[in-house]
From Swiss-Prot:
First-listed, main subcellular location of the protein, grouped into a coarse class: cytoplasm
Listed InterPro entries: ATP-grasp, ATP_grasp_subdomain_1, D-Ala_lig_Van_CS, D_ala_D_ala, Dala_Dala_lig_C, Dala_Dala_lig_N, PreATP-grasp_dom_sf
EC number: 6.3.2.4
GO CC terms, sorted: cytosol
Protein name per Swiss-Prot or TrEMBL: D-alanine--D-alanine ligase
Domain of life: Bacteria
Length: 366
């Protein structure tokens, strides 16, 4: 049987570069398991933090290394290798390794800007090769918090109160800014969260409890993005549900996250011992069933495909279930919620990876 060549695309320019490498290592291992190694051949392609795509031999070294950042530093100083990749081009960042032409299906385990925002998906679509995950539209909507919320509103999914802010409202007119802050205080009250609309890794996000903190947070967020979203804070359980499929997606059991930090930021997410995962979530069957239903609705609302993790708030005092966000390319590390939820739902990791590849092939064939 001819093996399918899987291009594992990892690394990238975002703040979640290291998480991507960790996820790629686990996926690469899954592709070598007994049930997969007869079907798939791995072609790893590593994208450095500076955007340079590396050939598969060096990319495999990154996957095998316990200290990939040291390998990257060495390789950035390797003039001969980088020169050979450019093939006399004025911009090495536009060069794709020759092994990419051999790929039958891509698995882009990339996060954040230029990874899960539709840009890499557009490139892969131009290659006319199947790829795991959402397409250009679903990825872009899943990354942009404002577009995402508009889609959720249109689908009738309840959310926390929010207000959209632009950089020009913050920086261009000193008379407008105080009125803007007044409106936020009146509409959302404290505490509230200030977030750049189109960044991952919790970059630029702040929880604010006063006027001075609000002003500082808005100014900081505007330095990252020209569009900002401010959300009302809510005291609630934080629940997550994994979704798998294309046009008829299915939802996993529901998980719950607890932590001691001020909010679920990057450090809390990815530092061992900072957060506790409860699978299944400590909620009633009725609440879990409703969340699973809402998760698939959210998946379809943004035109996602393949996979997504959907996050919720459950306000126990009122019984409200509020959708928070969708992540169209969640982490695949050993401590990531997405694969753990499917494992608990009866789909082991190796089977999950196989299913995602098959879903990519199915979507491409239609």
């Amino acid at each position: 049987m001819t093996k399918l060549r899987v291009g594992l695309l990892f690394g990238g320019c975002s703040g979640e570069h290291e998480v991507s490498i960790r996820s790629a290592k686990v996926i690469a291992t899954a592709l070598t398991k007994v049930q997969n190694k007869e079907k798939y051949e791995l072609i790893p392609i590593y994208i450095q933090k500076n955007g340079l795509w590396q050939p598969s031999d060096f990319s495999q070294k990154v996957l095998n290394s316990d200290h990939p950042s040291l390998l990257q530093l060495t390789n950035e100083n390797n003039h001969d290798l980088n020169t050979s990749l450019t093939q006399q081009s004025s911009s090495p960042l536009w060069q794709i390794p020759p092994q990419a032409a051999q790929v039958d299906v891509w698995f882009p385990i990339l996060h954040g800007p230029n990874g899960e925002d539709g840009t890499i998906q557009g490139l892969l679509k131009l290659m006319q090769v199947p790829f795991v995950g959402s397409g250009v539209l679903g990825s872009a909507m899943g990354m942009d918090k404002i577009a995402m919320k508009i889609a959720f509103d249109h689908a009738g999914l309840p959310q926390v109160k929010y207000q959209v802010v632009t950089r020009s409202q913050i920086w261009s007119n000193s008379c407008v800014f105080p009125k803007l802050c007044d409106d936020i205080e009146t509409t959302l009250e404290y505490p509230c969260f200030v977030k750049p609309a189109n960044l991952g890794s919790s970059v630029g996000i702040a929880k604010v409890r006063s006027r001075s903190e609000l002003e500082t947070a808005l100014d900081n967020a505007a330095s990252y993005d020209r569009r900002i979203i401010v959300e009302a804070g809510v005291e609630a359980k934080e629940l997550e549900c994994a979704v798998l499929g294309n046009d008829m997606p299915k939802a996993s059991i529901v998980g719950e996250i607890t932590y001691n930090s001020d909010f679920y930021d990057y450090e809390t997410k990815y530092t061992e011992g900072k957060a506790d995962l409860h699978i299944p979530a400590r909620v009633s069957e009725a609440i879990a069933t409703k969340i699973k239903e809402m998760a698939t609705q959210a998946f379809l609302a943004v035109d996602a495909a393949g996979l997504a993790r959907v996050d919720f708030f459950y306000v126990e005092k009122t019984g409200e279930i509020l959708i928070n966000e969708i992540n169209t390319m969640p982490g695949f590390t050993s401590s990531s919620m997405y694969p753990m939820l499917w494992e608990a739902s009866g789909i082991p990791f190796s089977e999950l990876v196989d299913t995602l590849i098959q879903l990519a092939l199915e979507r491409h064939s239609k």
